[in-house]
Amino acid sequence: MRIANKSEAVDYAYQTAEPQKQGWPLTAQEQEYILKPEFQRRPGSEKNKYLPNLWPIVPSAGFWEGRKWLDTHAQMVNHVQANTGSVDILLVGDSITQQWNSPLDVGKFNTAWQKHFGHYKTINLGIGGDKTQNILWRLDHGGLESIDPRLVILLIGNNNMFFTPETGVDPVANGIQMCVVNLREKFPKADVILVKIFPAHAPGNRFYEDIKQTNIALDKLHLEIDPKVQVLDLTSDLINLDGALKPALFLQDKIHLDQDAGYALYARKLKPLVEKSLRVKPAANDNKTISKQ
């Protein structure tokens, strides 16, 4: 795999009509484009083509009503640019990552993170609702040139399950792979821990079964053949022998982890992989997790 300079764009399978393919700040033309609902910006939409197999692997900005998603991303870019230089851990993902807590939330990381990783300088770039394509867009428009993480922890794909009736599961696995490729190209010195999608809902539920099949498809990509990539699968820790979720580990929505038991387990399982990657002392002099000022 060719490792590019941070400022270079990753080669994608399809080029949309997006006016600014990378970089920050955004031009007025780019802002106008990405404030359109996401379905209007999907690959092929500009040619009136239906290409759902490309949705998970081609960058697309996320969308909440109005400017909320873009404003959230902009706050994260500002946070990254205020914390330049060496960083121990960069967290990338959706709401499950965000709920380690982030600079946009309660101002400090949750109890499990602080217990196991609080001495590491950490930036959390988790945004609720994000899919693989949104992560790709954020990585290309995130002002990340100013930081140098030693380790990136990526968990993404859960929200892609809402669209697997159209996309299928293999493109989602390919989208996760593209996120890893993007991270490896932007941060060639960093290790990557890829966390496989957590089970959700119940056996027999489409969401549950599509997650299972996506993780199987991900296994077939053998991403861990790259010596700087580790893959973590918590499925067996999160379910009972009959496949049902362990209720103590999840919230009532059967998607998100319980802030106490769920994240405590997640942190314990992450810790050996983190310690393997961060073999020397934490970066920077303050040696602490970055939180909201």
Residue ranges and their predicted role:
Residues 98-111, 116-118, 132-177, 182, ...:
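Oxyanion-hole/transition-state-stabilizing segment in secreted/luminal serine hydrolases
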Residues 70-80, 130-142:
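A Trp-anchored, charged/polar loop motif used as the substrate-binding/catalytic surface
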Residues 123-125, 162-169, 202-205, 252-257:
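Second-shell loop/turn segments in exported
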Residues 88-93, 121-126, 150-156, 160, ...:
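Structural recognition of the beta-strand scaffold that forms the well-ordered cores
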